């Protein structure tokens, strides 16, 4: 992890929510970006981890893979009604000009009565999207549309 040991931090943005996620590896920065996104929706500390989803995605570049990863998690939240609290990225690979991710997301089916939402995320955007290698590992910047 970098930036003084933080997993992620929220940054000022006029209309949407912007955050930076940190990790020692690409896998860890993807995990922390997902955690940051779900903490916008709900306090993930209140979520159990009794439901799991396996995720495998391919994208043409690393930035698209991050957007696809977060968008897939948001889709599972909206369609399968699962709110996630933990993310395990097994690997991110580059092969034949494509990037792929193999991961699991752990959470629970949500009930609005017991798990009130804080903010609704409409979409993950490419606006100000960055993934960079740093001296301490990796940093990703993401803006989500609310």
From Swiss-Prot:
UniProt GO BP: tRNA splicing, via endonucleolytic cleavage and ligation
Coiled-coil region(s): none
InterPro entries, per database record: Archease, Archease_arc, Archease_dom, Archease_dom_sf
Keywords from the named record: Calcium, Metal-binding, tRNA processing
GO terms for MF: calcium ion binding
Role description: Activates the tRNA-splicing ligase complex by facilitating the enzymatic turnover of catalytic subunit RtcB. Acts by promoting the guanylylation of RtcB, a key intermediate step in tRNA ligation. Can also alter the NTP specificity of RtcB such that ATP, dGTP or ITP is used efficiently.
HAMAP family for this protein: Archease_arch
Family listed: Belongs to the archease family.
PANTHER family named among the record's database cross-references: ARCHEASE, PROTEIN ARCHEASE
Protein name (record): Protein archease
Organism: Methanosarcina barkeri (strain Fusaro / DSM 804)
Lineage summary: Archaea, Methanobacteriati, Methanobacteriota, Stenosarchaea group, Methanomicrobia
